[in-house]
């Protein structure tokens, strides 16, 4: 079966936003206008088609990024486009989901609330989009809300996100009088009835007289932005010649794809205004797979190569999300970059070098599914029946087992102990946690060796709450949850040299390993957080024992030296040693390295310290409670970074240790009579003050 829609008519986009900016509603409307869903699902009725897990509908937030396919006609050429939408969660505990979806997107729509503007989570999502080089357009939503201000959001995008927004529309009216928008390219007004019903089209009218000045100012900025895309257009602009509509669109698209500008549109998804022009902007300014940089990959030997987006050539696809579906079992969401993925064929998981059979292939529409035979380059779909593939793995042909870029996943910052309520739950809990950990690489499960308890770790309290909740609903496992524990780390402050000789002689074959190590701190937050150098000259330690020395140090780091927390940011250099022809073994060198490493780090000269996760906390509070909020931040060992005004509300940004933030939402509520809100995000690890460090050690070491 040949491809229905050529590659240049495909758009893979994400809709990313801060929680409550109206992202799911916007996606819903897009699906409605593109003819996929017939009844509009409202989030606050808990019926949105994109949010299909029970917990999401209850909490009114989006957790899993479902991938949905819909169609829209290009406003210029009228050709049908295939738009694949990845719905990304806006809550900070789910940034891992956003990272994942950014990885497979070609473009994104950043949704901002016209009242709330740029929030801390928006900054994180924006940084991730920059990191993966994703061009985007901005949609300012909720223009009908009290306090709506399109131009404020434009200023915040410039100041807080350091971006270059270029409005291609300006709003007509605001708050309850928001009626539509002026298209600055066609220079026409699009107006809607105030109570526009779903699916209602806008009327095209002349620009209202009271907006002429604003329109002229922003039209000028827009033309200048387009003219800067090339020297010819710049010359034309400077000579005072009008640029044609096609030249403006081409200029803006070129600069949008180069991430030099971000086109801005506005609307109110809930009130059905502005969604069709938003889709037109997606079609005109966001890239097809052929217009973005080809993905980088590596061969099995580790050589870097480029994998071009094309149907020709051997298949190369990336698994970016695993989900357990109640009807079909495990779904692996996959983006094909090259070649064709066909159902019923065998491919190689080149990351693990294991063969996999592609069972069924599905295209997902929010919560219905369509079975297909092939998935072509640039397309996104779900594979049923993969056994060994997890997030971030590459599926490729055996003839050309390329590995596409790997994704980096953040380490968890918080953990809790979970105990099954009954014996019967014990086994089920093991299976459930295993499945959840497969789906979500930022969620880890391990067993505490001393207490034998199962410890789960994740990106925040909400993250773990939702996972425990899913365990109860999807796997019917009842579990008791302990108090949250902070993921402390340990490191050293100074470089030390340490010699260690491990020699045992007790009849028969002895053990002998002898190493000289230099142990140095790396800069805070280094990636990777352990570096090993071998500077052995003249074979004083034979080559085959070097990996054992590295392994000994790496394993010693896991157990820490002060309070048993994993160590980070350390570089070890093996620079001398000796061996014994008969008694030396890998085991002996591993033990020598491990004991030498611990001894070196424990020495007073190394200056070992405990590190704790510091959170960037943003609190929005009415002015009356400002004093209490700041006083409380200081009490929690916080450092207030800034205080701003936003639409009559005070905005406090502070750095506060995670260990002081448990139960904060309840305290903040009672402090402000429920009127203040906050959000927090992990910022960095910092050294713990001495008195706190002693308490931690006392608790851990008894």
Swiss-Prot record:
The family database entries (SMART domains) matched by this protein are listed as: EFG_C (SM00838), EFG_IV (SM00889)
> What gene does this protein come from?
fusA
Q: What is its main location?
A: cytoplasm
**Which GO BP terms apply?**
ribosome disassembly
Q: Which organism is it from?
A: Aliarcobacter butzleri (strain RM4018) (Arcobacter butzleri)
Q: What is this protein called?
A: Elongation factor G
- What is this protein for, i.e. what is its function? Catalyzes the GTP-dependent ribosomal translocation step during translation elongation. During this step, the ribosome changes from the pre-translocational (PRE) to the post-translocational (POST) state as the newly formed A-site-bound peptidyl-tRNA and P-site-bound deacylated tRNA move to the P and E sites, respectively. Catalyzes the coordinated movement of the two tRNA molecules, the mRNA and conformational changes in the ribosome.
- Binding of GTP occurs at 17-24, 87-91, 141-144
UniProt superkingdom: Bacteria
Family to which the UniProt record says this protein belongs: Belongs to the TRAFAC class translation factor GTPase superfamily. Classic translation factor GTPase family. EF-G/EF-2 subfamily.
- Record-annotated tr-type G domain positions: 8-290
Keywords on this record?
A: Cytoplasm, Elongation factor, GTP-binding, Nucleotide-binding, Protein biosynthesis
GO MF entries: GTP binding; GTPase activity; translation elongation factor activity
Compartment(s) of residence? Cytoplasm
Tell me the lineage of the source organism: Bacteria, Pseudomonadati, Campylobacterota, Epsilonproteobacteria, Campylobacterales
Q: Which GO terms describe its cellular component?
A: cytoplasm
| Keyword Nucleotide-binding found | yes
């Amino acid at each position: 079966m040949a491809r229905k829609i050529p590659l240049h008519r495909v758009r893979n986009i994400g809709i990313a936003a801060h929680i409550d900016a109206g992202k799911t509603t916007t996606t819903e409307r897009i699906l409605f206008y593109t003819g996929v869903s017939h009844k509009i699902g409202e989030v606050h009725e808990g019926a949105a088609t994109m949010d299909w897990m029970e917990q999401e509908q209850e909490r009114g937030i989006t957790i899993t990024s479902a991938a949905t396919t819909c169609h829209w006609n290009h406003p210029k050429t009228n050709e049908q486009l295939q738009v694949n939408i990845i719905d990304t969660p806006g809550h900070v505990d789910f940034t891992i989901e956003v990272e994942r979806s950014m990885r497979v997107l070609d473009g994104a729509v950043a949704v901002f609330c016209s009242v709330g503007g740029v929030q801390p989570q928006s900054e994180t999502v924006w940084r991730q989009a920059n990191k993966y080089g994703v061009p985007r357009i901005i949609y300012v939503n909720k223009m009908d809300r009290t306090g709506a201000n399109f131009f404020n959001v434009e200023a915040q995008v410039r100041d807080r996100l350091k971006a270059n927004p270029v409005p291609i529309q300006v709003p007509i009216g605001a708050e309850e009088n928001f009626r539509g928008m002026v298209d600055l390219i066609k220079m026409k007004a699009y107006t809607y009835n105030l109570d526009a019903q779903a699916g209602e089209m806008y009327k095209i009218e002349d620009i209202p007289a009271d907006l002429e000045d604003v329109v002229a100012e922003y039209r000028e900025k827009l033309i200048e932005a387009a003219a800067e895309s090339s020297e010819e257009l710049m010359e034309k602009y400077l000579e005072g010649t009008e640029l044609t509509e096609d030249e403006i669109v081409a200029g803006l698209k070129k600069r949008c794809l180069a991430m030099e500008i971000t086109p801005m549109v506005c609307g109110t998804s809930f009130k059905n205004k502005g969604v069709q022009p938003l889709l037109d902007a997606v079609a005109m300014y966001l890239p097809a797979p052929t217009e973005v940089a080809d993905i980088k990959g590596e061969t099995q030997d580790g050589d870097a190569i480029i994998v071009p987006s094309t149907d020709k050539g051997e298949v190369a696809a990336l698994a970016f999300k695993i989900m357990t579906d109640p009807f079909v079992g495990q779904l692996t969401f996959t983006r094909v970059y090259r070649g064709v993925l066909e159902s019923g064929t065998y491919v190689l998981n080149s990351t693990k070098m294991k063969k996999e059979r592609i069972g069924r292939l599905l295209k997902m529409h929010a919560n219905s599914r369509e079975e297909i035979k092939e998935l072509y380059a640039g397309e996104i779909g779900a594979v049923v029946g993969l056994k060994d593939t997890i997030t971030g793995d590459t599926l490729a042909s055996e003839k050309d087992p390329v590995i596409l870029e790997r994704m980096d996943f953040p380490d968890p910052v918080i953990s809790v102990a979970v105990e099954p309520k009954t014996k019967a739950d014990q086994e089920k809990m093991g299976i459930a946690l295993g499945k959840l950990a497969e789906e979500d690489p930022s969620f880890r499960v391990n067993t505490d060796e001393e207490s034998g308890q199962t410890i789960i770790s994740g990106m925040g309290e909400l993250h773990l709450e939702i996972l425990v909740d899913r365990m109860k609903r999807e796997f019917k496992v009842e579990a008791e949850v302990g108090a949250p524990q902070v993921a402390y780390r340990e490191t050293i402050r100074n470089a030390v040299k340490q010699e260690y000789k491990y020699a045992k002689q007790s009849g028969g074959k002895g053990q002998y390993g002898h190493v000289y190590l230099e142990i140095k701190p790396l800069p805070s937050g280094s990636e990777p957080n352990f570096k090993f150098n071998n500077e052995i000259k003249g074979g004083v330690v034979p080559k085959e024992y070097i990996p054992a020395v590295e392994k000994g140090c790496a394993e010693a780091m896991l157990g820490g030296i002060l309070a048993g927390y994993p160590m980070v940011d350390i570089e070890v250099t093996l620079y001398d040693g000796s061996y014994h022809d008969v008694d030396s073994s890998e085991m002996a060198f591993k033990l020598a390295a491990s004991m030498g490493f611990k001894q070196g780090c424990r020495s007073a000269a190394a200056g070992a310290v405990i590190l704790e996760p510091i959170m960037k906390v943003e609190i929005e509070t009415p002015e009356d409670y400002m004093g209490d909020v700041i006083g409380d931040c200081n009490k929690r060992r916080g450092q207030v970074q800034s205080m701003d005004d936003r639409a009559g509300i005070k905005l406090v940004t502070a750095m506060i240790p995670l260990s002081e933030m448990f139960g904060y939402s309840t305290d903040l509520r009672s402090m402000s009579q429920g009127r203040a809100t906050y959000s927090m995000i992990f910022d960095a690890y910092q050294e713990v003050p001495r008195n706190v460090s002693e308490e931690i050690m006392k608790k851990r070491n008894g």
